[in-house]
Amino acid sequence: MKLVIQRVKEANVAVDEKVIGKISKGYVILLGIGKEDTKETADFYINKLLKLRIFEDEQGKTNLSLEDVSGELLVISQFTLYADASKGNRPSFINAAAPKEAEELYDYFVMKCKESGTTVETGSFGADMKVSLVNDGPFTIVLDESIKK
C-alpha cells in the first residue's frame, strides 16, 4: 500500500465536471493498493494516518493530528503509484492490485476511516477524476512499505 498524504486547506474531486467530494481542512490521500496488500495492511496505514501529527500547534510545531484539528479526509484511488519505469519509457503497473481486489480494499480503507469518526469524502474508484486542492505548507508525506522496516 502506498499513501501520498497532502495537508490541505480545502480540496475537491470532480467526475465529468461534477464535484463528487469536497473537504475543508484536512488531508488529500492518494491511495495506491498493491497486489500483496490485505485488510491488515490497510489497518496498519489507517492507524498511522489518523495519528500523524502534521498540523501545527500554537507554537508552530507539528504536534496535532487530524482528530485534534477536526480535519477531514478526501481519499482518491490511484493505482499509478505502483508505476515501475525501470525498464524502457512506458511504465508497468504489474505490482498494482487487480481492479476488483483493489476496489474492495479501497472500500474497506474508506469504511474504517469513517468508523473512526472522521469525515471522509471520496473520488470514484477507477474513474477519470479532476482533483483540486489548496496545499497547506505545502506539507506532503509518502507512506509505503519502507515505514514498516
From Swiss-Prot:
List the SUPFAM superfamilies hit by this protein, alphabetically. DTD-like
Q: What catalytic reaction does the record list?
A: glycyl-tRNA(Ala) + H2O = tRNA(Ala) + glycine + H(+); a D-aminoacyl-tRNA + H2O = a tRNA + a D-alpha-amino acid + H(+)
Query: Which InterPro entries does UniProt cross-reference here?
Result: Daa-tRNA_deacyls_DTD, DTD-like_sf
Question: What's a Pfam family this protein contains?
Answer: Tyr_Deacylase
Establish whether keyword ATP-binding is in the entry.
no
What does the UniProt keyword field contain? Answer: Cytoplasm, Hydrolase, RNA-binding, tRNA-binding
Gly-cisPro motif, important for rejection of L-amino acids: where is this motif? 137-138
Q: What is its main location?
A: cytoplasm
The protein's location, in the record's own words, is: Cytoplasm
Q: Cellular component terms, GO, for this chain's entry?
A: cytoplasm
How does the entry describe the domains?
A Gly-cisPro motif from one monomer fits into the active site of the other monomer to allow specific chiral rejection of L-amino acids.
Q: How does it assemble?
A: Homodimer.
What's the protein here called? D-aminoacyl-tRNA deacylase
